[in-house]
């Protein structure tokens, strides 16, 4: 066999393995959804409490409400006390569960002592690191970002540091009890080069790599650590997009994503978003990085937010 033939065979084999792996992951999701549902008491078996950052609205509140429906007491942490109180009342009314609130601004450095004091000693079975912010509502190039120095500081603190610090606070108890789940909310755009969302996308890549490494370190301790990477979810961050075949309500997405808790250290949270992720990842990088794509994507977000 000539060198050229060997190269062609190896290239074809690699392509088949990659494609086969993607098909296998979809089959695993279908099998899990249809034939391997989580036991009814799964979440309460992990511990009494669930802690959710960014839990006053959107995906965070949906996680809090769903975990409360599953029988857990929940702690929601967010910046605005008034929004926290409203969310807590709504969750308690809808589920009859116990809700505790902690007001904390995750763009700040000095909040973690306060958080630790309020959750220390609790039997925490689930941690959802959901809190996150965009550097600007309309995507733009890095140097066009308003108050760039402040935005850099806020993004690193809120999207990156908060996840690491919350894991640092909660993980020791989970390790001691040899049970627990940590869900770190990322984004589908972390899977591709994403100019004009550079800061945000890069922060979510950190979420994915940190979570993968942490899962490898602690899976033997009975702890599940998973990245959840949605695409379209109708929240304030996405301008309350109208739900459709691709865009989920926060409640729909959370219910779906929890079904795939045992499918590995990463999930898009739904079969629809998994297929979308495969399509997006197949787009050539030069297309995603082109000025034309950046312009049209920026215009799409502007028009979406005007609706």
From Swiss-Prot:
Membrane-spanning ranges: 6-26
Annotated GO MF terms: testosterone 17-beta-dehydrogenase (NADP+) activity
EC numbers: 1.1.1.64
Xref: InterPro entries: NAD(P)-bd_dom_sf, Sc_DH/Rdtase_CS, SDR_fam, VLCFA-Steroid_DH
Name of the top EC class for this enzyme: oxidoreductase
One Pfam short name: adh_short
Active site: 200
Membrane topology annotation: Single-pass membrane protein
Tissue expr: Expression shows strong sexual dimorphism. In female, highly expressed in ovaries, and at lower levels in skin muscle, eyes and liver. In males, strongly expressed in liver and at lower levels in testis, spleen, kidney, intestine and muscle.
This protein's name: 17-beta-hydroxysteroid dehydrogenase type 3
List of residues binding substrate: 187
Species the sequence originates in: Danio rerio
Cellular-component GO terms for this entry: endoplasmic reticulum; membrane
GO terms under biological process: androgen biosynthetic process; testosterone biosynthetic process
Binding site for NADP(+): 47-76
Location(s) in or outside the cell: Endoplasmic reticulum; Membrane
Keywords: Endoplasmic reticulum, Lipid biosynthesis, Lipid metabolism, Membrane, NADP, Oxidoreductase, Steroid biosynthesis, Transmembrane, Transmembrane helix
Record keyword Chaperone present: no
Catalytic activity of the protein: a 17beta-hydroxy steroid + NADP(+) = a 17-oxo steroid + NADPH + H(+); testosterone + NADP(+) = androst-4-ene-3,17-dione + NADPH + H(+); 3beta-hydroxyandrost-5-en-17-one + NADPH + H(+) = androst-5-en-3beta,17beta-diol + NADP(+); 3beta-hydroxy-5alpha-androstan-17-one + NADPH + H(+) = 5alpha-androstane-3beta,17beta-diol + NADP(+)
PROSITE patterns: ADH_SHORT (PS00061)
Main localization, broad class: endoplasmic reticulum
Function field: Catalyzes the conversion of 17-oxosteroids to 17beta-hydroxysteroids in the presence of NADPH. Favors the reduction of androstenedione to testosterone. Testosterone is the key androgen driving male development and function. Cannot use androsterone and androstanedione as substrates.
Pathway: Hormone biosynthesis; testosterone biosynthesis; Steroid metabolism
Lineage: Eukaryota, Metazoa, Chordata, Craniata, Vertebrata
Family: Belongs to the short-chain dehydrogenases/reductases (SDR) family.
């Amino acid at each position: 066999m000539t060198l050229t033939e060997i190269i062609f065979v190896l290239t074809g084999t690699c392509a088949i393995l990659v494609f086969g792996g993607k098909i296998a992951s979809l089959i695993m999701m279908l099998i899990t959804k249809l034939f391997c549902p989580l036991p009814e008491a799964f979440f309460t078996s992990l511990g009494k409490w669930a802690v959710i950052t960014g839990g006053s609205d959107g995906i965070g509140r949906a996680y809090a409400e769903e975990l409360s429906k599953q029988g857990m007491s929940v702690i929601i942490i967010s910046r605005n006390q008034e929004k926290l109180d409203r969310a807590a009342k709504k969750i308690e009314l809808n589920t009859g569960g116990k809700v505790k609130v902690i007001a904390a601004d995750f763009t700040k450095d000095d909040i973690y002592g306060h958080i630790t004091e309020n959750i220390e000693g609790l039997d925490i079975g689930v941690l959802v690191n959901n809190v996150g912010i965009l550097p600007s509502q309309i995507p733009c190039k890095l140097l066009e970002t308003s108050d760039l120095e402040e935005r850099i500081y806020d993004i690193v603190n809120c999207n990156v540091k908060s996840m690491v610090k919350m894991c640092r606070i909660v993980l020791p108890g989970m390790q001691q009890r040899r049970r627990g789940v940590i869900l770190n909310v990322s984004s589908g755009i972390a899977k591709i080069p994403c100019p004009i969302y550079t800061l945000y996308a890069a922060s979510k890549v950190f979420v994915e790599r940190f979570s993968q490494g942490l899962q490898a370190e602690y899976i033997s301790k009975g702890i599940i650590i998973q990245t959840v990477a949605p695409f379209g979810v109708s929240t304030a961050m996405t301008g309350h997009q109208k739900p459709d075949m691709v865009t989920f309500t926060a409640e729909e997405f959370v219910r779906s994503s929890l079904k795939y808790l045992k499918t590995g250290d990463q999930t898009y949270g739904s079969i629809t978003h998994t297929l979308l992720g495969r399509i997006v990842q197949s787009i050539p990088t030069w297309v995603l990085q082109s000025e034309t794509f950046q312009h049209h994507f920026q215009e799409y977000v502007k028009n979406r937010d005007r609706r």
